[in-house]
Amino acid sequence: MDQSFDQPWPTSLAEARAIQQHIRTRIITHDAHGPIRTVAGVDTGYSGDSALAAVVVLAFPSLEVLDYAVARRQIDFPYVPGYLSFREAPAVLDALASLRIAPDLLICDGHGLAHPRRCGIASHLGVLTDLPSIGCAKSLLVGTHEPPPDVRGAWTPLHDQGEVVGAALRTRPGVRPVYVSIGHRVALETAIRFVMACVTRYRLPETTRAADALASHGRIPR
């Protein structure tokens, strides 16, 4: 991508909380995107005191791998639940800036609005890059939900403090749901459709599988 995302990062929880609260006011929760022809999976792994971010761009809807990038950054922010984007986003932004093909949509291995301050990494990255983004997480961070029916594509709302903050989505019968939430510029039901369009034989969408394999093992599954 012909773009740099350099910016100051917080040095305290108070600064980080203020940044999240500011970003929250800029999140667009309705569909505000053009045609989606490329979709990128985003994931981050750890090695010692550094974060290794991987971004894999796939054609949509064919899911052919078109481009990928990795970036390593030293972690300068402590591990605190709810603030992981400050550990991971700097490396992810470096990887995004290295891409030759700009994605039309980000699907992040993490949460968006389904977050204590409604600003998980999917929303954080979406607002900073102004790219449409979706959170698709393997585990729950906040909220409660009824079990979705054991049918591919079935989902139930994820509630937290009186709000619908996401969805528990059954991507395949007989497997645990994933947790989909708005990141930026994509409505919830649209986000669910995009995630399901990226699911093939596995519980996780191909975007997540590709980025996770690249971050963890240095290769993309075929």
Curated annotation (Swiss-Prot):
It catalyses: Endonucleolytic cleavage at apurinic or apyrimidinic sites to products with a 5'-phosphate. Mg(2+) binds at residues 43, 109. The record marks 79 as: Interaction with target DNA. Its cofactor is Mg(2+). GO terms for biological process: DNA repair. One of its GO terms (molecular function) is magnesium ion binding. One of its GO terms (cellular component) is cytoplasm. Its main location: cytoplasm. It comes from the Bacteria. Its EC number is 3.1.21.7. Transmembrane segments: none annotated. Coiled coil: none annotated. Belongs to the endonuclease V family. DNA repair enzyme involved in the repair of deaminated bases. Selectively cleaves double-stranded DNA at the second phosphodiester bond 3' to a deoxyinosine leaving behind the intact lesion on the nicked DNA. PANTHER family: ENDONUCLEASE V. This is Endonuclease V. It comes from Roseiflexus sp. (strain RS-1). The lineage of its organism: Bacteria, Bacillati, Chloroflexota, Chloroflexia, Chloroflexales.
